[in-house]
Design a protein with these regions (language model features):
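Phosphate/NTP-binding elements of NTP-utilizing enzymes
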Residues: 2-265
Length: 265
């Protein structure tokens, strides 16, 4: 069995391993390919603070996010803290990389460490997939991965130099409101031409609001249909378990100002 593992990791399949398929697996693979929501809800595992490794049970707004990502090229999401926005995003990117060959995906965050953490969560979900759903692994480290189908994922900080010179099918910008305005503007002026040159390339921006900046401008323009982004807004009360009692307790343990900043989008 060790002959089939990537660098001795029993949870990863190396490249050029012949897969023997059952009829049921062929049907299931086809269903997963066609339906990202089915794939995520059936096969993606995430780490819960209270329960450890568990299936990803999606909230209604998370399902809406995935559907919007899948059907549109440009999406911008405004969500409160700790709402599962990043988990939703990496689950979609996992599906996209598995079932679309030769795609390049960039996971970009305001800090490189945050981007690497997001990639790490995607890698954990990947390791917990059945082997017949996995692509063979070509390379696998803290900053990037490459699969046998030619798809690659890069994790980096959001900067013009991060993806300059490369062509990307999906650019995911996490907590974009926290990227300094000058960096955000340089990034878009450098990267947008390569994105706009494709017909199926995607830009997905997900953030908690943070003042008047490029995220604010893109969000406002999306709401008023001055750009091509599809806006998705989630209120803290849409997250199960968050009610008025939770709000009052959170304010008591922090402050009303902090609550308004992080949860009252």
């Amino acid at each position: 069995m060790s002959d089939f593992t990537y660098l001795g990791n029993p949870n990863l399949k190396k490249a050029n391993v012949q897969q023997e398929w059952t009829e049921e697996q062929v049907k299931e693979y086809a269903r997963c390919m066609q339906d990202p929501l089915y794939f995520i809800q059936t096969y993606v595992r995430i780490v819960s603070l209270d329960e450890g490794l568990i299936p990803f049970k999606m909230y209604p707004f998370q399902k809406e996010m995935v559907g919007t990502f899948h059907k549109n090229r440009f999406t911008i999401c405004k969500l409160p803290r700790q709402s599962g926005k990043s988990t939703t995003m990496i689950s979609y990117l996992l599906h996209y990389s598995l079932f679309n060959p030769n795609v390049n995906i960039a996971i970009l965050a305001n800090k490189a460490a945050t981007a690497r953490d997001l990639l790490g969560r995607l890698q954990l979900a990947y390791e917990n997939l059945p082997k017949w759903l996995q692509q063979g692994v070509m390379s696998w480290n803290k900053g990037s991965l490459e699969l046998e189908n030619g798809s690659k994922i890069l994790a980096s900080s959001t900067s013009a130099s991060a993806v300059r010179g490369g062509s990307y099918n999906i650019i995911f910008l996490d907590e974009f409101a926290y990227v300094p305005s000058n960096v955000a503007e340089q990034f878009f002026s450098s990267v947008y031409p390569t994105i706009s040159s494709g017909k199926s390339t995607k830009v997905i921006i997900v953030s908690t609001p943070h003042g008047m900046n490029m995220f604010y401008k893109l969000w406002t323009d999306a709401e008023e249909k001055r750009n091509s982004y599809i806006p998705i807004e989630v209120h803290w009360s849409e997250v199960p378990g968050r009610d008025e009692k939770w709000r009052e307790e959170t304010i008591k343990n922090t402050s009303e100002q902090q609550f308004n900043t992080e949860f009252e989008c």
